[in-house]
């Protein structure tokens, strides 16, 4: 979903799948093909070709091993990205910690994935969790879809402690209004 947006902004997205999923996880029965080996091989090819991304975006991540692989990739490029980052060229790391919605973790995702996502969002310049993911990442209002304005501020502050940079919470609903 991010590719058209970043393409329109003038970036050339390189894509590498983390998993192939037979159906969304909410049906309870699904098949996931782990693509970690493919990711590792793809990154090696990118390095051999001298690819130098101006933007790194992550979405669904299957395992701690993938978090480590992505983290290593980001760290190997981040000093250069920080050196040239400015508003005009948009060099950044964006993390969408896809793991939960509707007040609960997706089927097949446990607290070990939440811990791995905390590590991954620490590399981000921009993180875009939904309300449920923000709650699980921070431990503030976990499992809730609505929060008061003060709880939402607390959630944003908690997310800032994880990355210290920009935070956008999607699908947040103020519990004090209808």
Predicted region positions:
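Conserved phosphate/ATP/ADP-binding segment of small-molecule kinases
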Residues: 107-178
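Conserved N-terminal subdomain of the carbohydrate kinase-like
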Residues: 2-95, 99-107
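Conserved active-site and cofactor/substrate-binding residues in soluble primary-metabolism enzymes
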Residues: 1, 33-41, 51, 65-69, ...
């Amino acid at each position: 979903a991010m590719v058209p947006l970043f393409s329109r902004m003038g970036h050339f997205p390189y894509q590498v799948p983390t998993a192939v999923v037979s159906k969304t996880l909410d049906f309870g029965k699904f098949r996931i093909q782990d693509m970690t080996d493919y990711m590792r091989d793809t990154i090696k090819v990118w390095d051999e070709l001298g690819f130098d991304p101006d933007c790194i975006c992550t979405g669904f991540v299957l395992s701690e091993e993938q978090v480590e692989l992505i983290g290593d990739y980001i760290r190997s490029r981040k000093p250069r990205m920080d050196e040239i980052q400015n508003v005009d060229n948009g060099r950044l790391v964006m993390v969408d910690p896809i793991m939960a919605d509707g007040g609960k973790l997706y089927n097949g995702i446990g607290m070990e994935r939440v811990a791995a996502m905390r590590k991954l969002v620490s590399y981000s310049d921009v993180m875009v969790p939904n309300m449920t993911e923000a709650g699980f990442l921070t431990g503030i209002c976990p499992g809730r879809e609505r929060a008061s304005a003060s709880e939402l501020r607390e959630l944003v502050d908690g997310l800032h402690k994880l990355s210290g940079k920009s935070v956008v919470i999607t699908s947040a609903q103020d519990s004090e209004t209808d």
